[in-house]
Amino acid sequence: MRIEKPWGHEIRWAVNDKYLGKILHINAGSRLSLQYHEQKDETIYVMEGTAVVHLDGKTHILSCGDSLRIQPGQIHRFSAPDECYVKLIEVSTPEIDDVIRVEDDYGREK
């Protein structure tokens, strides 16, 4: 299922009571909200492009083939550089609505 987002779109390819699988396409120069999860545990894999990841106050640059685990409570944000989109695979526990936004460029609810 494709879902349009203000930063690009996501495709949910696996949704069940055990796990969640998504592909995130982040447009060039866009970023997701600064957020954390109370229960959701996720692992990100970079399929295409370069991802800029802000995790617990530090900035990480992930290239194609890199992966990163984000555990509950870790404040994080994914973004794409100005010159190129990034495509990520996310596999996580199934808590799809477990998002607490700390900061959001698009005015969405925290």
Language model: regions and residue ranges:
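A short, sequence-level motif marking secondary-structure junctions
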Residues: 39-40, 66-69, 106-108
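A short glycine-rich, His/Asp/Glu-containing loop-to-beta-strand
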Residues: 1-36, 40-41
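Glycine- and acidic-residue-biased ligand/ion/polar-headgroup-sensing regions
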Residues: 39-52, 56-57
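Short beta-strand His + acidic residue motifs that chelate non-heme Fe in jelly-roll/DSBH
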Residues: 33-34, 44, 53-54, 70, ...
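Short acidic-glycine-tyrosine-enriched beta hairpin
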Residues: 57-75
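A generic "binding-loop/recognition-motif" signal
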Residues: 19, 30, 39-40, 58, ...
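Double-stranded beta-helix
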Residues: 2-5, 77-110
